[in-house]
C-alpha cells in the first residue's frame, strides 16, 4: 500500500467523510487547530524571546520554561489532535499539496532541533550562547512552519485533480467522486 493509498483509505472512512462534509464540525476542528497553534506557538515564541533576552528579563529562564510547560502541552495536544482530523478529512488533497509536505518537513526539523538542543533547554543558564542559537533557529523554523501551514489553504488544485475535487480544492466541503 502506497502513502497515497493510505491517505485515500483514511479519507474515505466514515468519520473523515462526515467531518469533511459537515458545515459545522469542520470549522470547529479548524478553529481548534489554529487556537492550539496560537497557544503552542505563542508559548514557544515567549520562551525563545526570553532565551534571547528580549522579554521577561527579570524572570529566570528556567522559571519561564516551567511556567509555560503546561500551556505548551495543551497547545500541542490541540494542534496534533485537530491537525490529524483535518489531514484525514482531505488526505488526498494534502498528499498533492507541496505546502503540506513543507510543513511536515519543518515539523520533523522541529523535532530534530528539540533533540539537538535538549541539554541547552534543560539548563539554558549553563549554555547561554547555545541557548541564543537554539532560540534563533527555533523562531526561524516556526515562522517557516506557520507560513507553510497557512499556505496549504491557498494552494490551487492541479488541473488533473479538478474533475475529482472541483476548482475550489481545499476551501470546500466535498466528497471524492
Put a short name on every predicted segment:
Residues 1-177:
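Polytopic transmembrane helical bundles with strong interfacial aromatic enrichment
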Amino acid at each position: 500500500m502506497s502513502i497515497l493509498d493510505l491517505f485515500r483509505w483514511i479519507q474515505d472512512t466514515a468519520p473523515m467523510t462526515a467531518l469533511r462534509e459537515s458545515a459545522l464540525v469542520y470549522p470547529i476542528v479548524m478553529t481548534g487547530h489554529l487556537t492550539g497553534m496560537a497557544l503552542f506557538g505563542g508559548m514557544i515564541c515567549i520562551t525563545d524571546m526570553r532565551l534571547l533576552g528580549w522579554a521577561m528579563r527579570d524572570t529566570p529562564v528556567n522559571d519561564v520554561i516551567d511556567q509555560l510547560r503546561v500551556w505548551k502541552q495543551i497547545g500541542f495536544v490541540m494542534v496534533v489532535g485537530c491537525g490529524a482530523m483535518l489531514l484525514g478529512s482531505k488526505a488526498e488533497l494534502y498528499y498533492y499539496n507541496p505546502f503540506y509536505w513543507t510543513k511536515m518537513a519543518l515539523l520533523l526539523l522541529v523535532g530534530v532541533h528539540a533533540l539537538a538542543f535538549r541539554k541547552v533547554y534543560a539548563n539554558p543558564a549553563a549554555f547561554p550562547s547555545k541557548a541564543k542559537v537554539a532560540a534563533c533557529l527555533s523562531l526561524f523554523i516556526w515562522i517557516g512552519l506557520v507560513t507553510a501551514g497557512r499556505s496549504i489553504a491557498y494552494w490551487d488544485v492541479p488541473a488533473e485533480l479538478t474533475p475529482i475535487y472541483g476548482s475550489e480544492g481545499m476551501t470546500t466541503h466535498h466528497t471524492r467522486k
